[in-house]
C-alpha cells in the first residue's frame, strides 16, 4: 500500500484527546495540528520531540490538513500509528495471495456482518474450502527490544471479537486472529497480559476452541506499508 500523497517530516509537540497531535513541520517550522487515527495508548510512541511523518491532504471537508502516519525511530526503523491502514495493507496482500496460510482463497470480502452486531474484517471463501473469518489487530507496542505486544490498553471490544471468532470455529469455519505488527524493529510477538488480563484469558479460551492465530510483520517506509513474513508468537 502506497500513501496517497508524499509524507512530510515533523516533530511531535504533544498528543492529546487521543485523536489530536500538535507538531512542528521540518520544512518551515510551522506549528500545525494533525489527526491521530489511533484510539490506543500509543505507549512509547508519543513522547514530545519524537520524529514523525505526516500525510497532507487538501480535502475541503477535513478541518485538519495532516494525518499522522509514522513514527521514525531515527535508526532505520519505523512504526505505523494509523490504525485505519492495516486492513488496507492486508487486503492488498490477501487479494494478491501473498499470505501463505490463506493463499488458497480467491474471494476476499471486507466488513461482513456476523456474530453479535459485529463485522468481521475479512471473510474469505473458495470452492472446496471452509469459509475463513479473519479478524485483524494493529500491533504497535514494544516494551522489550525486538518483541511486539498486544494490546497497549484495555480492549473489551477485542475480547468480544475473540469470543465471536471462537463461535465461528465451533460452527466448522476457519477463524483466524491475525496480528499485524506495524513496527519494523520486532521479530517476535506476545500478549500484554499485564495490561489486559481479560483479553489474554479470552485469547487462550478462543485458541482452545479452535481459533487460529497468525502474526505478520510489515515493511514500512515513508512511501508505503506492505505485509512481510510471519513473526513467531511466543506466549
Curated annotation (Swiss-Prot):
Gene3D superfamilies: 2.40.50.580, 3.40.1350.60
Full protein name: Sugar fermentation stimulation protein homolog
Gene Ontology molecular function, alphabetical: DNA binding
Classification via Pfam families: SfsA, SfsA_N
InterPro entries: SfsA, SfsA_C, SfsA_N
Similarity annotation: Belongs to the SfsA family.
Endpoints of the signal sequence: none
Listed HAMAP family: SfsA (MF_00095)
Amino acid at each position: 500500500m502506497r500513501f496517497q500523497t508524499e509524507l512530510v517530516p515533523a516533530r511531535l509537540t504533544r498528543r492529546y484527546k487521543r485523536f489530536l497531535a500538535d507538531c512542528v513541520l521540518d520544512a518551515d517550522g510551522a506549528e500545525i495540528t494533525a489527526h491521530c487515527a489511533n484510539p490506543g495508548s500509543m505507549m512509547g510512541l508519543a513522547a514530545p520531540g519524537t520524529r514523525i511523518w505526516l500525510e497532507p491532504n487538501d480535502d475541503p471537508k477535513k478541518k485538519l490538513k495532516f494525518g499522522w502516519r509514522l513514527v521514525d525511530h531515527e535508526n532505520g526503523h519505523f512504526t505505523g500509528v494509523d490504525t485505519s491502514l492495516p486492513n488496507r495493507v492486508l487486503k492488498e496482500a490477501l487479494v494478491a495471495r501473498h499470505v501463505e496460510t490463506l493463499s488458497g482463497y480467491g474471494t476476499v470480502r471486507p466488513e461482513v456482518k456476523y456474530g453479535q452486531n459485529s463485522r468481521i474484517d475479512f471473510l474469505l471463501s473458495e470452492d472446496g474450502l471452509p469459509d475463513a473469518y479473519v479478524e485483524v489487530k494493529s500491533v504497535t507496542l514494544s516494551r522489550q527490544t525486538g518483541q511486539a505486544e498486544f494490546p497497549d490498553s484495555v480492549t473489551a471490544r477485542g475480547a468480544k471479537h475473540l469470543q465471536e471468532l471462537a463461535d465461528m470455529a465451533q460452527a466448522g469455519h476457519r477463524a483466524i486472529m491475525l496480528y499485524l505488527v506495524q513496527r519494523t524493529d520486532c521479530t517476535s510477538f506476545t500478549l500484554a497480559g499485564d495490561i489486559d488480563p481479560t483479553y489474554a484469558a479470552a485469547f487462550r479460551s478462543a485458541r482452545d476452541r479452535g481459533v487460529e492465530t497468525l502474526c505478520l510483520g510489515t515493511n514500512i517506509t515513508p512511501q508505503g506499508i506492505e505485509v512481510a513474513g510471519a513473526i513467531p508468537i511466543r506466549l
